[in-house]
A protein has these predicted regions:
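Conserved tyrosine-mediated DNA breakage-rejoining catalytic core shared by Y-recombinases
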Residues: 18, 174-181, 187, 191-196, ...
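Basic/aromatic-enriched alpha-helical hairpins
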Residues: 52-62, 73-141, 158-160
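Short, basic (Lys/Arg/His-rich) helix/loop patches that form interaction surfaces
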Residues: 134-137, 196-206, 215, 261, ...
Length: 388
């Protein structure tokens, strides 16, 4: 059987331009004629380009270079409006992304996706860092780095989506280390330090803080607790209060899943006494203000900072309550799965952090035990020598 040679020009055509360069033409996916994205110095290179396009079409890997002419701004806005990579964004996250697009990323809105190069991204990154540093220069401790990290991370994520949509061939966000969170590990809030801070706070905050510690609550989850969430020594954590552009709204928990956390008996007894001595409906706030509305995380944080700084423990934040409670649970022998259930974590990674902290704390305790034991042994030996 004779084999017919494939004519690669049957798929397209080439012609020489007055400049001497060669132009390649071939049908687009809809069958309409289109030009290659660039011209070629030789006829052979133009023919090879046509052959490559044809092969990509057959493999299903073809990318129409014209698709990348879409401006970044409209593409990014549509990506956010459609829920990002997973098709759903939390209200707070969507508001953050919209603010970043309107702020640090505004200068890229009119740029075609395919026209954004790694050099462009580096120039934008340097320029934006200077702008953000200038904007926060009068705010003590502020650097603008967190905002820059958020903006770069969003830009990289959106351009990754453009790669998957075959609008661009590769992601131009290639700055090493940019967009990564490098927050230092928070200091360990010991029960002794916690007791000291709570003791320096007004009494109205004592029980809310102990509940947050014992149930490993996020501040927003503490705000959203209702009287009916407590039953038989445990609290049901179903919701949180978040703030979007200053407006507080109630949403499901951060992971979208509810959890039941058994409180330490001493704290459970305090909650029962609190509920028995106050009135309200099951959906009333567990910890209300004088006007009947729920306490706010802002007021709690303010009271905490004032008390902590007043006794020389300003390094601790109210958000350290959750970390401290989970670390203590790990020290008490909690397994990874048990810590995940109590904290509401989806993956084991976060739970392992608390177990690691517990291991470090256990090592400190062991060293102290060894030291105390050595002192006692020497005392016994000394007494024994005296008897002799």
């Amino acid at each position: 059987m004779s084999r017919q040679k494939t004519n690669r020009q049957a798929f397209g055509s080439v012609r020489q331009l007055p400049s001497g360069r060669w132009q390649a033409r071939y049908p687009d996916p809809a069958g309409r004629p289109m030009n290659a994205p660039a011209t070629f110095p030789t006829k052979r290179e133009a023919q090879d380009h046509i052959a490559g396009v044809r092969a990509d079409r057959m493999r299903g890997t073809y990318r129409d270079h014209r698709a990348g002419l879409q401006p970044f701004g409209p593409y990014a806005a549509e990506w956010v409006a459609n829920g990002g990579t997973r098709g759903r964004l939390a209200a707070k996250t969507q508001a953050l992304y919209e603010d970043l697009l309107a702020g640090p990323l505004a200068g890229l809105h009119d740029r075609a996706l395919s026209a954004i190069t790694p050099a462009d991204v580096r120039a934008w990154y340097t320029r934006t860092r200077k702008t953000l540093q200038k904007a926060v220069k009068n705010r003590p401790g502020a650097t603008g780095e967190a905002r820059l990290r958020q903006a770069y991370s969003l830009l990289r994520t959106i351009l990754n989506a453009a790669v998957k949509d075959r609008l661009i061939s590769e992601n131009p966000c290639q700055i090493e280390g940019a967009g990564q969170v490098n927050d230092p590990e928070r200091p360990y809030l010991s029960p002794e330090h916690l007791a000291a801070i709570v003791g320096a706070m007004p009494e109205k905050w004592h029980l809310p803080i102990r509940v947050a510690f014992g149930a490993h609550l996020r501040v927003g989850e503490l705000e959203a607790l209702q009287r009916g969430d407590y039953s038989n020594g445990a609290v049901r954590v179903e919701r949180q209060r978040i703030y979007v552009r200053g407006q507080g709204i109630i949403t499901p928990t951060k992971t979208g899943e509810a959890r039941t956390v058994v409180l330490p008996p001493s704290i459970a007894a305090e909650v029962e006494a609190h509920l028995a001595s106050t009135t309200g409906f099951p959906k009333s706030p567990m910890f209300p203000r004088r006007d009947g509305e729920a306490i706010t995380g802002n007021a709690l944080s303010h009271a905490w900072r004032k008390a902590a700084r007043g006794i020389g423990l300003g390094q601790f934040h109210v958000h350290d309550l959750r970390h401290a409670g989970l670390t203590l649970a790990a020290q008490a022998g909690g397994t990874t799965r048990e810590l995940m259930a109590r904290a509401g974590h989806r993956t084991a990674r976060a739970a392992l952090i608390y177990q690691h902290a517990a291991e470090e704390r256990n090592a400190v305790l062991a060293e102290r035990m060894d030291l105390v034991g050595a002192v006692r042994v020497e005392s016994v030996r000394g007494a024994d020598r005296m008897l002799r």
